[in-house]
Design a protein with these regions (language model features):
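The alpha-helix within a helix-turn-helix
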Residues: 187
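Short, charged juxtamembrane terminal tails flanking transmembrane helices
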Residues: 281-285
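Short, Lys/Arg-rich, polar N-terminal cytosolic tail immediately upstream
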Residues: 1-27
């Protein structure tokens, strides 16, 4: 026979009053959490929703029909696609080494990537001038290759790479780290070389995470502004087009270009997120 000790009634509590059942408390906590999450979700989406209320298809069409209005879109797409290619070619090996390598100064590598992430973009632009500007040794070397890292498409790509690379490298590192190393070891036991095991095992399993990292980097590159305005004021991409239109003709004229930037930048991250979520669901199932 077991005995239960009844808690003493507290101030204002009738001696026979029962404590609130645990399920009720859990339901109240869940409802409060859901309400808080809904408030945060609405607050985060508020600016986007507001933009759709203030911009109509007619205003977007009218803005894009203006002479030269499509040039910033073409420049942004061209620079963004080249930036993604650079990130995949250079950032993926670095991310793999950070996740799998046994480098003696691995923490130093990670600290360098984090430092570039935490630097304000405007500061990045200023530092790039002193690193790759025309009067620097690197700038002079680039000049021999007929490349200029200021006010050119090449300069825009450099700025976008510096602003977006940390997002891709850290995201790709997390994607590689999430793959169980024992899968690679099993492939090696079956006779696969490390490079073949990476292609057949690691990359397919890490692909959703890599796609998500690349999509975030794409959005970051498309919206790059701080470093761009310092070293690549020309040719205009969409962010600078929004800025100059705002300065010259006002907020109402800049909003259509803001909507175009969202339409170009956001679909890839959304698609990558849905693919990643589906892949996680398949693994759990």
């Amino acid at each position: 026979m077991s005995w239960a000790v009844r808690p003493a009634p507290g101030p204002g509590r009738a001696p026979g009053a029962a404590l609130a059942p645990a399920p009720v408390l859990r339901s109240a906590s869940a409802a409060a959490s859901l309400a808080g999450a809904a408030v945060v979700w609405i607050a985060l989406l508020g600016p986007v929703i507001t933009l759709f209320f203030h911009v109509t298809p007619g205003t977007v069409s009218s803005a894009l029909r203006a002479p030269g209005a499509l040039t910033p879109l073409v420049v942004s797409l061209e620079a963004g696609l080249i930036t993604l290619a650079v990130l995949v070619c250079l950032g993926t090996p670095l991310a793999w080494l950070m996740a799998r390598g046994r480098l003696p100064a691995l923490r130093l590598w990670e600290a360098g990537v984090l430092a570039s992430l935490l630097l304000p973009p405007l500061v990045v632009g200023l530092l790039l001038i002193f690193m790759v500007g025309p009067l620097t040794p690197i700038g002079e070397a680039l000049g021999h290759l007929h490349l200029t890292a200021t006010n050119t498409l090449f300069a825009l790509i450099v700025a976008e790479v510096y602003e977006s690379a940390p997002y891709y490298v850290l995201g790709a590192q997390a994607a590689f780290a999430a793959v169980d190393p024992r899968m690679e070891q099993q492939a090696a036991l079956l006779g696969d070389r490390p490079s073949r095991a990476a292609r057949r095992v690691t990359l397919p399993l890490a692909a959703p995470g890599l796609a998500m990292a690349l999509a975030v980097a794409w959005a970051r590159a498309m919206g790059a502004f701080g470093a761009v305005i310092i070293i690549a004021y020309h040719p205009y991409g969409l962010p600078l087009q929004i800025w100059t239109t705002l300065q010259e003709t006002g907020l109402a004229s800049a909003l259509p270009f803001a909507l175009v930037l969202l339409v170009v930048a956001l679909p890839l991250p959304v698609a990558a997120y849905l693919w990643s979520a589906r892949a996680r669901g398949r693994r759990r199932g």
